[in-house]
Structures are given as C-alpha cells and as structure tokens.
C-alpha cells in the first residue's frame, strides 16, 4: 500500500474580495498533515490583492490524548489600503491581526455522525492610518486603534448517509475586558465587551431527478451590543448573497438563506460528473443592534440566477456565477461584482 503524500499545495484565484481594496485576489496554501510524525498538521496561506498585502493564515494543530482531542494555534493577518476611487488618493491603511488558541474534542465520532465541542480564546488588534498618521477610520476606535479579546464556545454536529449530509454549527462568543480590550460606554459605539451567537445549518441532498444535488445553507448571527467590524457579519458576495458586491452590508446581526441545485450536464468517459449547471436563490437581511448606529437601517438583499461549476484535472475546480438582484442596491461603480459576476 502506497502511503499518501502528507504535503499538499494549491493555488486559488477569485474576485471574492471587496472592490474597495481590490476585488481580484490570489492565494497559495501549503499544508503538511504529519509534520513531526505524530499526526500534527501545519498549514500556511498567503494571499494578496491590489490593496491587500499580506493576507496571512497560519495554523498548527496537534492531537492530544487517545480520543481525538486537538489543540490548535492560529495567527491571521490582514493589511489593506483603500484602492477604489475617490478615496484611493487619501492613503488610508489598515492592519488587523488575530491570535488564537483552541481546544476541540469530539464526544461522538462514527462513520455516519460526529458531535464535537470546542473552546477558543482570541485576541484581535486593529489599527488605521490616514497619510501615515493614526486615524479613526472606525467610530469608537481612539487613535485609530481597537482591541478585542473573546472567548468562544462552539458546537458542531454532522450526519452523513449515501443520500444526504446534514451539518449544524453553533458558536457563542463573549467579549471580555482583558489584554487592553477597547471599552465604550456609549451604546451607539462598538464595544469589545459583548455577547453574540452564530448559527449555521447546511443540508446537501442527492435527488433522483437528473442526479441533481440540492445544496442549502442558512446562517444567523445575533448580538446584544454594537460590534467592532472584526466581530460583525457581512451580507453580500459569493458566500452570502450573490449578485451584490462583497461586504455590501456589514452588520451586528444578520440572517441569510441560500438554496442551490447542481445539475450535471457533462459526464466523463469514466462516468464522473464534471460539469454542473447551478441555479440558485439567495437572500440576506442585516441590521444593527442599536437603531442610532450609523448605517443602521435594516437592509434586505435578494438574488436569483445560475452558475457553472467545472471539476477537472486532479481536483482542480472552476466556477462562474451570475446573480440577478431582485432588490436593487444602487452603486455607481463598475466592478464585475457590481454586474453580478463572481
């Protein structure tokens, strides 16, 4: 039996970034699934766009004990400058860093189902400048800086069969006043002391008609306080509501639903479906916790249309989606995303 190569590498290019910082982005990811020989994994991702450099994501995970418990260290960094007119001449820069430590333990682990719990501690730092000087780009961030320290309790459940996959994710987050976390007493300003809940459900079902695969996903986030952007949720873009530009809405709370049918239209000689037509319906609604917050008006985004998915050589993947806005969100920009293309 030939042992699988533990070293993996892959490239990715898409336009899933905000046009404000350059929509088109590229990534390279390197991963080793048995770095020191005891099942530990290391992954490193580097990416950039016209205005973002670098996007870094480093994660090292080690198994602990005989019951598949894992401990992970993670570091993420996201530096960007505004590239879209008319603000590109202002030299607006932002740097965000997130440090994380997590423990994950599966209490049920079978071939057809899994239930796991996780506990994560994170510390985030963000700073903004205008022309090289500290600048309050985000209201409530004195001298352009804010810090958020949070504890997160996660629950994951997955059930698999030959016909379907059901996965549920729940995460409670608490912002604590530690490690210099930014506190604002005004309820209309973001606060690092908060409580929020994020829930996600996904259902993938194999239908008998034309071997169609139905993919549905729902996401909800609720918060008791106005949040800093690193804790908020985005509505609009490839993975929320297609047909709108990425980060059309950034809100404390949101509810999103996506339903997509993947119909095979080309099968290889080996009998593998490789090209799919994917009609979809997306909807998202976002709102702020406090009504007086700037940009607080609730907004609903709705779109329909279709995409093409092509799985080709050795796991390579290509997809192109066009989304038609059913609720118009006016923009005078001329990016591909503004024309519904992802």
Tell where the protein language model's regions lie, with residue ranges.
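Outer-membrane beta-barrel "beta-signal"
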Residues: 30, 308-310, 336-342
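Outer-membrane beta-barrel initiation region
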Residues: 1-72, 109
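Outer-membrane beta-barrel translocator/channel fold
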Residues: 75-99, 105-106, 129-131, 324-339
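Transmembrane beta-barrel strands of outer-membrane/channel proteins
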Residues: 11-15, 28, 42-48, 73-79, ...
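Transmembrane beta-barrel architecture of outer-membrane proteins
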Residues: 25, 53-55, 96-100, 148-152, ...
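Residue-level signature of outer-membrane beta-barrel architecture
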Residues: 32-34, 62-64, 105-107, 157-159, ...
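C-terminal outer-membrane beta-barrel translocator/porin domains of Gram-negative envelope proteins
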Residues: 19, 127-275, 279-283, 287-289, ...
């Amino acid at each position: 039996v030939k042992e699988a190569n533990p070293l993996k590498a892959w490239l990715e290019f898409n336009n899933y970034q905000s046009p404000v910082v350059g929509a088109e982005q590229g990534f390279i990811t390197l991963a080793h699934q048995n770095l020191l020989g005891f099942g530990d994994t290391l992954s490193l991702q580097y990416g950039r766009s016209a205005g973002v450099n670098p996007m870094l994501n480093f994660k090292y995970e080690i198994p602990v004990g005989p019951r598949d418990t894992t401990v992970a260290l993670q570091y993420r960094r996201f530096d960007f400058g505004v590239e879209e007119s008319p603000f590109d001449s202002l030299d607006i820069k932002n740097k965000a860093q997130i440090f994380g430590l997590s423990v994950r333990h599966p209490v049920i682990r079978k071939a057809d189902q899994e239930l796991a719990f996780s506990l994560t501690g994170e510390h985030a730092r963000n700073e903004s400048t205008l022309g090289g000087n500290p600048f309050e780009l985000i209201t409530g961030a004195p001298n352009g800086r804010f810090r958020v320290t949070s504890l997160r309790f996660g629950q994951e459940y997955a059930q698999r069969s030959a016909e379907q996959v059901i996965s549920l994710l729940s995460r409670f987050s608490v912002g604590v006043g530690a490690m210099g976390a930014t506190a604002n007493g005004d309820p209309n300003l973001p606060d690092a002391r908060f409580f929020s809940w994020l829930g996600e459900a996904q259902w993938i079902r194999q239908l008998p008609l034309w071997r169609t695969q139905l993919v549905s996903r729902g996401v909800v986030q609720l918060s008791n306080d106005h949040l800093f952007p690193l804790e908020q949720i985005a509505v609009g873009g490839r993975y929320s509501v297609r047909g709108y530009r990425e980060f059309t809405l950034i809100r404390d709370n949101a509810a999103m639903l996506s339903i997509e049918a993947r119909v095979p239209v080309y099968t290889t000689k080996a009998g593998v479906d490789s090209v799919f037509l994917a009609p979809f319906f997306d909807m998202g609604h976002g709102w702020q916790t406090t009504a007086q917050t700037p940009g607080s008006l609730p907004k609903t985004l709705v779109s329909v249309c279709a995409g093409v998915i092509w799985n080709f050589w050795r796991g390579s993947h290509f997809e192109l989606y066009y989304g038609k806005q059913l609720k118009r969100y006016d923009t005078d920009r001329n990016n591909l995303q503004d024309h519904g293309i992802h």
